[in-house]
Amino acid sequence: MLLYVCLVNLLLPLSDGAVNPELVGVLVKVGVDAALQQIDEVWKGSTVRDWKCAVENKSNKTLYAMGTTPESGSMTTILDDIPPENTGIFVWEKSRGAATGAAGVVHYKYGNKVLNLMASIPYDWNLYSAWANARLSDDKVSFSDLYYGQNGAKSATKGGNWGEVDGTKFFLTSKSHAEFKVIFSGK
């Protein structure tokens, strides 16, 4: 199986000698599990809350990166386009020093539609749970709409369960360093 890995930036050491998990997007022509394992080998972050996502594009069109809508934290990798039959990877971390989780929406252009992927990893597991959602729509969808299942969005799926919406199958683990697996068929 061909493996295409595009690393635009490597782990950058901070002035105090610690490792800074500033990585680039990784584009891999393998399955979701192999892609997540690949990023584990290069990303050695020490954040309290984060989620890494592998988006497997099983459609016949390229998913064009459109950016993010942060709720808490931000993407720490470059969001790349994902050609058909390829897998794109990115990492989202909580804001450093803040008592918040890691939550936001990633947007990809798919033809004349937008694929919106939402994940939320809580700061306090005693009060909150991990949630994920997806929606293929005409425009970008807000975090709030995806989290609460409003304005046409389906209800979010609790971490530890498979969800399926608009040709998108996804699974978010319920742990502080979560894995968000997304399989997009475009159907």
Swiss-Prot record:
Belongs to the actinoporin family. HALT subfamily. Its main location: other. This is Hydra actinoporin-like toxin 7. It is found in: Nematocyst; Secreted; Target cell membrane. GO terms for cellular component: extracellular region; nematocyst; other organism cell membrane; pore complex. Keywords: Cytolysis, Membrane, Nematocyst, Secreted, Signal, Target cell membrane, Target membrane, Toxin, Transmembrane. GO terms for biological process: cytolysis in another organism; monoatomic cation transport; pore complex assembly. It holds the Pfam family Anemone_cytotox. Composed of a long N-terminal alpha-helix and a core region rich in beta-sheet structures. Before the pore formation, the alpha-helix binds the lipid membrane, partitions into the lipid-water interface and stabilizes the monomeric molecule on the membrane. Finally, it traverses the bilayer, thus forming the transmembrane pore. Transmembrane segments: none annotated. Residues 1-17 form the signal peptide. Octamer or nonamer in membranes. Monomer in the soluble state. In vitro, interacts with folate receptor alpha (of target organism). It comes from the Eukaryota. Pore-forming protein that forms hydrophilic pores and causes cytolysis. Compared to equinatoxin-2 (AC P61914), it reveals lower cytolysis activity (5-12-fold difference, tested on erythrocytes), a larger pore size (probably 2-3 nm) and different affinity to membrane lipids (100-fold lower affinity to sphingomyelin). Binds to sulfatides. Shows cytolytic activity on HeLa cells, with a different potency than its paralogs (from most potent to less potent: HALT-4>HALT-6~HALT-1>HALT-3>HALT-7>HALT-2). A motif (Cell attachment site) lies at residues 158-160. The lineage of its organism: Eukaryota, Metazoa, Cnidaria, Hydrozoa, Hydroidolina.
